[in-house]
Design a protein with these regions (language model features):
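Alpha-helical transmembrane helix bundles of large polytopic membrane transport and channel proteins
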Residues: 95, 105-249
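Conserved nucleotide-binding/hydrolysis micro-motifs of P-loop NTPases
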Residues: 19, 42-43, 74-78, 100-105, ...
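Signal for well-folded cores of large energy- and translation-related assemblies
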Residues: 8, 45, 60-61, 88, ...
Length: 265
């Protein structure tokens, strides 16, 4: 919300989302009145358990959003990137605002933004809502991505066996789901997400085919489908973080050790 206020200033409208008592805030970008931003309720995943989470998820899957500005807490990167992977899979172009970067610096930690962007496959901009840095840049990046197509996007890649199952489910789905979000729906069906299963008008044949794909994959992994996806997401996130994170304290200690060795010699 702090970032939203900085981007929109006083150009805001406040109301409720239809059918629920969840506050709805939208606004025009101060420096580009052609851009409208919806301040969605904060969520940690695309599996909703509260009215606020369902509002955010439903809006993102409504095909109305041209771009997602994903605010990531730089001090809690791994937990926040779990949602980021799911947002990328919606097929909507994502730009990540790596917020609270100033707090991270104070902890003696660094994130290589370029490496994070490369391995995530989305634009990433370091921001600080408190110090009001990086705000204009991240809005420009997000605006630029609105022209991207699904073919331009890079999705998180998981274990080959899970990828094979996702591909098979995509074949079964065909045109039964919006093509932009097809991968998202395929993964959610693999996880046996009850909300998605209820929303989609699939034939009995399609449902049986998907059940068989899930059963065989669970036997191969010797895990249940939901656990397979959770573990694969975190494995992907861990690889990304290892590539992008560094600790200045660790570096200083290593440098000190090197100097000690030189002096000793």
């Amino acid at each position: 919300t702090s970032l939203f206020n900085l981007i929109t200033g006083h150009n805001q409208r406040v109301g409720n989302w239809p059918g629920v008592t969840v506050e709805r805030k939208s606004g025009l970008v101060k420096k580009n009145k052609d851009l409208e931003i919806q301040d969605l309720p904060g969520i940690y995943s695309m599996s909703p358990y509260s009215p606020e989470e369902k509002v955010a998820r439903d809006y993102l899957l409504s095909q109305r959003a041209d771009s997602i500005l994903n605010v990531v807490d730089a001090t809690n990167l791994e937990r926040n990137l779990y949602l980021t992977t799911q947002l990328i899979e919606t097929g909507i172009p994502v730009t990540s605002a790596l917020n609270m970067i100033d707090v991270l610096d104070g902890q003696g930690k660094k994130i290589n933004v370029d490496k994070l962007s490369y391995h995530l496959g989305v634009p990433v901009v370091a921001t600080s809502a408190l110090k009001q840095t990086g705000v204009d840049q991240v809005v420009k990046k997000a605006a630029h991505t609105t022209t991207s197509t699904v073919g331009d996007l890079a999705f998180p890649i998981y274990d080959d066996r899970l990828e094979a199952a996702i591909s098979q489910i995509l074949e079964v789905l065909g045109n039964s789901v919006p093509q932009r979000s097809a991968r998202f729906y395929a993964i959610k069906l693999f996880e046996q997400d009850s909300l998605v299963e209820a929303e989609l008008d699939l034939s009995q044949f399609q449902r049986k085919e998907i059940e068989d794909i899930i059963r065989i994959t669970e036997e191969i992994f010797t895990e249940d489908a939901e656990s397979i996806v959770i573990n694969e997401r975190y494995a992907f996130i861990e690889r990304v973080c290892q590539m992008a994170e560094s600790h200045t304290e660790d570096f200083a200690l290593t440098l000190s050790d090197k100097i000690d060795r030189i002096v000793s010699n």
